[in-house]
Regions:
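Short, Lys/Arg-enriched, Trp-marked, Pro/Gly-tolerant hinge/linker segments that flank
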Residues: 1-11, 19, 33, 48-56, ...
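Basic, amphipathic alpha-helical hairpins
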Residues: 14-26, 46, 50, 67-76, ...
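Append "Primarily bacterial transcriptional regulators
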Residues: 29-37, 42, 46, 80-87, ...
């Protein structure tokens, strides 16, 4: 069971990610800074309440948002990569395929 304080913390983290998603500077350090804590404290807090590290949480959020954009828009894959703040196309394809088992184009066609 998640405590209210932990839920509020994760809501704050998610809001920061949404606000900065298109920036390739979105990293745990940025989140920690915006929350007024150091990066080690952010990692400790995540370890206490999540199975993911802050870095993995950001990556997972980016991939989920990209998947949503593939289904709900006609944006090109390149435009989606830009919108989710990833600057390396091959990295995006590798991570997307690892998470969903198909390429972004295949994912779009399947939906």
């Amino acid at each position: 069971m998640i405590h209210q304080e932990d839920k509020e913390f994760m809501d704050s983290v998610t809001a920061i990610i949404k606000e900065n998603l298109a920036q390739d500077t979105l990293r745990p350090e940025l989140i920690a800074d915006k929350l007024g804590m150091n990066t080690r404290a952010l990692y400790r807090r995540f370890k206490k309440i999540s199975l993911l590290t802050p870095s993995d949480f950001i990556k997972d959020y980016r991939m989920m948002h990209a998947a949503r954009l593939l289904v709900t828009t006609n944006l090109s894959v390149q435009e989606i990569i830009y919108q989710v703040g990833i600057s390396n196309k091959s990295y995006f394809y590798r991570e997307f395929s690892a998470k969903y088992g198909v390429t972004p184009g295949e994912y779009r066609r399947m939906q």
